[in-house]
């Protein structure tokens, strides 16, 4: 596909692309392809339409466009809306231009049938394999040869079967095959998508041979073998050129770093991964056999700690092929870096380095250069630059490198020609522009350069000769200069890479390290023309072949023979003779070459003659015809002919001294550094030069400053200068000076109230001076991290010496830079032998793994298998013999001791490591005797048997674990059974005893009934007999009396008649005594029931003097006449009037008690029935006269005395007619106050709820002889019948009351006025006293029990504004009133001014009552429970929004408002944020006083504010608590703080906070708390994490270091590109392909399907419980919030377990519906137990299984900072739901650990408890290993908690500093506004630190002296500008504080350098203003 832009009209018309479509139709004929034009917006239907029109196809048919990718083996049918151009852009670049079929990426046009199916022409070809398989199944065709992944498993071992097996696997694109533990890799010359990270995970910790052969498998085995055996390992990669050694090395390094880093790539891993591309660019080139041939050898040794963490690495290079720089053969190229540079640089860089095109350079264009992959080379240059940055090259360093490369290319363009005229025999060098450019690039003089390139200087004893070069000598000198310069550059790059890979701790401490070495050395080469380089390369391959045969054949067979096991020796080809031919002293070819090179007149012919003379009879040395200057050596891989030309010159290839002197005199320090002999010496000289230059610069700067100072002194000063202001008289009495001093003193006094807390105020005042005139030089800001100017990992002499010592043997270039040395440097061959021997020595100390790389074909064709070439390589590598010995040998070898330790579980207990025990075990396990042998000291096993033993060991361990578990479960079950049995026996015994007692009781009852019945019968008979007798007697007596009476009557009549007649004349005026005696009988006696029972209380209240009932005891004379009268006819004894009164009182009290119980039960039935009963009570109640004019001065004293239980008996009094116009009537029902408050020892008082309404509240006193002792009766009367006054409870027990009263405030000595109310402190004490006395009461009535079951709310009252004597501190002791009165009085007085005056809050709405009706907490708290609230509101008539106009402001009490606000719910986090700011303002108002009670209040409020911050900063932003929980939390904080300080009285503090909370709820509406979507809202969460989730995948950014493929589009991912990697399933894809993925993650998808059947909240995956609105599961959030509100101060919070039944109940409730669960009903330990249970039951822990190994490896890092960085890096790859939930949980644990002194929960204890819940090992892991990992798991969680604690403290300290600065700025702004008209403004002392200090406060006088005016401030300024700055600063501080607050819970992975920057910034708060000022100036 080719693209064409539209030129200047490109903006209007999009680019067009040419697509090649290959029709696959029957009617297409001979048409091979069709070319159409399309754009990125063209769809598939548009392209098909163009193709049909171009090919003249039948338009009525249906066609489809098919995308073919042969690499993936798939065909994709494009939809009609797809864009073919977009698909092409995803292909490799080589296939994008023309995309022929040969590249494997093309489009097909196919025909679609009517049913939608596609007609495939090649379907017959596809059907052939299927038909063949059917024939094989029927037995008609022979079965194909089996696919053996291990050549040792071949049934018949020969070359043919070996070759056939490899070819069969190669055709199936299986390029890896095992030969025992040796890996055979065949180069396919094509990228295969088998190297993605998921393959690394697949082969991790797997046995060799369990999965398909792979290079990752060998790397994994080497890594874990090193960790298991603690022995160094090495991987030797061998093979001829083009066999894929370099690529295999890259794969190995990638896998080893991936196994080590496990999600956390430190600097060493990144450098190792980046070093490969850099070395390949500078050391690899394209040859005829290989497009990426290594022209040098390298050995990368990766050092590990014993835990498997990378410690460092060393790269050693061997014999760079320098001759390739100046000459190449046909179809070969120079080093890659030149082409990258020329084709990839930008135009600016091209001009800077003066670069041309590759065809313009002689070193690059020697055989008609034709570059076809230009686009790929451009991208390779970008990847090279990225790799150089990973290694640590700075941009300036890269420019220096590219400048040297450009100079090398220009050296090749230097031409020579002989001078045409003159006697001068010299040469002319040119062209001039090349010389000019070269001198500029190298920074040398042009004349010196020309002289060096054309003349040679020779120094003799007496003379210095300058001789011109011949033409050939000049060219040789030029090329030698270029080669030496490039070699020096390559050495310098290797040196810098080693420095970057060096661990600086290796210079300070000696730590035992392990290592894995990967050898990638040049392969065996046999070209058409072989020279000195091929001779050295093949010698190195001979050494490696010898090393291979030594380990595979010789050493192993010798070990078998030494152990005495039966073994038949296997013959192998030994190449030691060839090695001796080349390197044996003194006749080896290398030594002969060195001798001949030292002879001045020797030539190549003399050298060849000497070779033939010495080795004519050697079978490995073959001569050639005399005329041919060459010789032949018989290598292990075959015969190679070497051309003898240039052997001597290349062996002594070094710079001439004049060239070295030229480059060392360069003005470029980099060039001098390259040519320097000793890098350490060069570095030291550079340091010295830099120091001298710095001194010179400083001296010059000092001189210039002195000159400016002199000029300034000599000049004329300005009218207003600093000196003028300072010279003003301090004691002047000018008005401005006096005004200044007064204002200064005023400020100093006001500053005393600021939050110094014992600190120096000047420390904070320093920020204010900067507020007036912002400076632009102070740029440090919290949100901006300054770019690092000084780079890290700078060179130093110590590290350089260490690197030089490690690579001393490889100084091939530096050894040739000797100047004027008498002793010649060593030759190239000598240095090569030295470095090769060093390499073999390192390999000999390690256990080797071998990879045999084989070239599939010589033409570099993709997936082409050349049988002959492959067979040749198999033969010379001895693969057949290798397979044979691997097949017959024993790969597993154990000493007896190692075997016993390894398989101890399988052996008997306490067995000795001996031959007999091991043999018995193997016999017992029935191991095949053919697969093992036992030698003298070792056991030899085949790999299959070793794996079988490992499996048996694993199974035995699992069996024993299960056995232990079963035993433990048995013990638990037995214990449970015994407990159940004991419980059953106890229940049975109780039941039997109950039955016996029941029988006895029934028997006794029967006997009692019988006795009663018998007695009844006897009494009945007796009474009947007595009644009969009495009746008879009465009849008899009556008869006698009547008879006597009749006689008397007759006699009387007679006497009367006689008397009437005789006394008719007597006087009629005197009354008779009988009439006077009958007068009282006409008046009926009044019923005692009609009298009132407690009228004496009313009488007492109406007494003029207000005396107590004790002082006005009614006398017996005050009784009613009815009580004093006795009937005249009564002959029996009548009870006295006192006894009658007592009986009436007793009956009245009993009736009241019955009424009390009845009303109490009625109130609990239904709230709707209360109002009618209250109305009935009002209608039938007593009517008392009202007298509001007399103030009740002794009300409190009256209450105190009436409370005494020993008052004398009171007699009901019937008032006289004038005072009682209507008789007292008994009410139909008595309304009793059910809110019976218990009694506390601290007080014996109870204040009425509405005491200030008048004197109408009646008081009732119990009878002392009452057995219940606490039954009370209260009557209510009020002229306004809308609401009734609340009741006052009375109690008994005079001694107890007196004792309690003595402990409380002596209130009886302080009589109150009529309007005085109880203080909040008194009310709270009363509330507390009631509960304690109720506990002490031994006998309780029903009323008392009901009062004890409900928590009481204190009735707080506000004093009337008219009463100046009463105040909030009226109840305090005398000594403390004066201290605390001012502040608290100010607090309560000023809040009425700035808050809403509305009285709407007084009324209780129906909503709050209904809500309270649902809650019934049983805890003893300060708030009122719902049931109590209902009882309180029973007697009140709800007003439903109407104001009670009869109530005054003074009657609105705090307690009434608290009842309303306590049940108010918190809707969102902003409400808590407003409350936090509200409390901050209130606390700042109270900081001026330092009384103990205020100090307690301030500190408690600060702690409470910290709790609020942690609440509204949680991720969810949702609050599940109310103000009731806040009040309880504050009470807990105050209680603990008071216990620490020894304070006993905390009631006043609680009352103050209660009033503040009440004021806050009245001051704000719910609409004020609605979140505003703006800048502040965005700060609530941190920036978007680097993790991207899709379909269960957790993708993170990933830099590709080896060839990989996208698993979605199957296209190539370029090296060093950014891709996305799933941290769970290791899926890799392009960033643009993420949203196209339709498959779910292999792990998370399975979990969701398994858990979908049982919905709930326990045992469910975290991501299923979260959503966009709820980022944290509701169960977790609700449990954590409740614990943080009520349980942080509980000792052993998570250590103790709750009740099992309560825990189960809570779990079941949360499982059903968490939103409806009331956690207040459950104990705190049950809640914590459910929290731990929820975490344990997660299918996958919060710290997921995928990151389990990563966390363990992070803990194993040596340094704490590295551990923390690794842990946070792994946390960043967690899924979003897990990360957010873990963040919330860790934040909770931090809050718990901060209170370790109280709850005894340290970070270590919390880690022990929560580590098994958060970080569990996978189920398929080894149990033994998992047990060892417990300590690491605990350490990981503990470190996380401690680090988050540290960050939390740092952030809170920053917030405190910001609040202090905000307070100062606000005070300053207030003063400026108050004093705006004044001409002078206050100055402050200049800052000297920028942070708050702990120094003691200085006296005021000293403050006045030091807080003087700054001169620049005294000069005047713009106060308006200062106000603006202050307002901006306050706003900036608020934003900064809010940002820090919202970042409190974050698991922030920032590094230490950024943390230091942040801490410095936060410590100096003025930086905020400076940054804002700078930004504003920049914007302007």
From Swiss-Prot:
Residues bearing PTM Phosphothreonine: 1319, 1965
Q: Which residues bind ATP?
A: 239-246
Annotated Ras-associating domain ranges read: 15-114
Q: Does the keyword Chloroplast apply?
A: no
Give the Gene3D superfamilies listed for this entry: 1.10.10.820, 1.20.5.190, 1.20.58.530, 3.30.60.20, 6.20.240.20, Kinesin motor domain, Myosin VI head, motor domain, U50 subdomain, Rho GTPase activation protein
Describe, from its UniProt entry, the tissues in which this protein is expressed: Expressed in testis, lung, thymus, brain, liver, spleen and heart muscle. Detected in lung, testis, spleen and liver, and at reduced level in different brain regions (at protein level).
Per UniProt, the Phorbol-ester/DAG-type Zn-finger stretches lie at 1592-1641
- Chain segments carrying region Tail: 1046-1980
Kindly give the Pfam families that the UniProt entry links to this protein: C1_1 (PF00130), IQ (PF00612), Myosin_head (PF00063), RA (PF00788), RhoGAP (PF00620)
- What InterPro entries would the database entry show? C1-like_sf, IQ_motif_EF-hand-BS, Kinesin_motor_dom_sf, Myo9, Myosin_head_motor_dom-like, MYSc_Myo9, P-loop_NTPase, PE/DAG-bd
Q: What is this protein called?
A: Unconventional myosin-IXb
Q: Which gene encodes it?
A: Myo9b
